[in-house]
Each structure stands twice: as structure tokens, then as C-alpha cells.
């Protein structure tokens, strides 16, 4: 049975979003939500959840390279808990180390320096988080 999954790249100013299917194990970038100090416009997130009707939400967990937590880690956990509480959907956390670096590299290779826009980086990062989740959950 196909499962639709939405992934989020949490940030204090922008939250990238991507969608994917368990059958194809591919992700497609959707949008980046503006946030103020990590607080998103919940109505925008609700709209995308209603549109895609996901079975699962995945939130990228920012960790240091050695696997230890950083200040943003707890904020991402809080965001994940709020998603679960508001929308009553299961939420999984996925290690997101190096996704922003990989996203920048991918965007730069396609369009050079001028293509490196923050919202594009965040949505590609959300895709990479979801693809990583697929790789770890066959």
C-alpha cells in the first residue's frame, strides 16, 4: 500500500517542505514556509497537509557531525511534537547532517551562484531528508 509522506527541514526563519511516496521512494520539493524565530504560520502547514493528506510526517533532526545535539535540535523536536499534536499524524525524526551542504552543492551545479536562494535550499534539503528516511526505512 502506498504511503504519502511530507518532510520538513526545520529552521528558525524558513521551513522547507517536500512530499514523497513509499512506492517510488522519491521526493519532490514543495515550498518553504516562512517562520518567525522557529514559529511557522500553522495555517500554511495545515493547507499543505490537507492538500497532500500524508500518512506520516518526517522532520529533519539537526545534529553536530559527531552526532551530539546542538541548540536547534531541541527546537526541531518541539516542532515535530507540535505537528503531531496539531494534526494527529505520526511524526518521525531523521538525521539531517550535511543535507544543507548537499542541497547547496546540487543547486549550484544546476544554476551557479545565482541559483542559491534560501527557499530553494530549504526545499531541496527537505527532499534529501525524505530520501534519507526512505533509505533507512526500506
From Swiss-Prot:
One GO BP annotation of this record: rRNA 5'-end processing
Q: Which GO terms describe its molecular function?
A: nuclease activity
EC number(s) per UniProt? 3.1.-.-
One Gene Ontology cellular component? cytosol
Q: Provide the primary localization.
A: cytoplasm
> InterPro entries this protein is in?
RNaseH-like_sf, YqgF, YqgF/RNaseH-like_dom, YqgF/RNaseH-like_dom_sf
Pfam families in the record: RuvX
Which keywords belong to this entry?
A: Cytoplasm, Hydrolase, Nuclease, Ribosome biogenesis
> Cellular location of this protein?
Cytoplasm
What family does the entry list? Answer: Belongs to the YqgF nuclease family.
Functional description taken from the UniProt entry: Could be a nuclease involved in processing of the 5'-end of pre-16S rRNA.
Looking up HAMAP family in the UniProt record yields:
Nuclease_YqgF (MF_00651)
What is the official name of this protein in its record?
Putative pre-16S rRNA nuclease
Species of origin = Haemophilus ducreyi (strain 35000HP / ATCC 700724)
Amino acid at each position: 500500500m502506498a504511503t504519502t509522506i511530507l518532510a520538513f527541514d526545520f529552521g528558525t526563519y524558513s521551513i522547507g517542505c517536500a512530499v514523497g511516496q513509499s512506492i517510488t521512494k522519491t521526493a519532490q520539493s514543495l515550498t518553504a514556509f516562512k517562520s518567525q524565530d522557529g514559529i511557522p504560520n500553522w495555517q500554511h502547514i495545515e493547507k499543505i497537509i490537507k492538500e497532500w493528506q500524508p500518512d506520516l510526517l518526517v522532520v529533519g533532526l539537526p545534529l553536530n557531525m559527531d552526532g551530539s545535539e546542538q541548540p536547534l535540535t531541541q527546537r526541531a523536536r518541539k516542532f515535530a511534537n507540535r505537528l503531531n499534536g496539531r494534526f494527529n499524524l505520526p511524526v518521525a525524526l531523521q538525521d539531517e547532517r550535511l543535507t544543507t551542504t548537499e542541497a547547496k552543492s546540487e543547486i549550484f551545479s544546476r544554476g551557479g551562484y545565482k541559483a542559491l536562494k534560501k527557499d530553494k535550499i530549504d526545499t531541496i534539503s527537505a527532499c534529501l531528508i525524505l530520501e534519507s528516511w526512505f533509505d533507512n526505512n526500506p
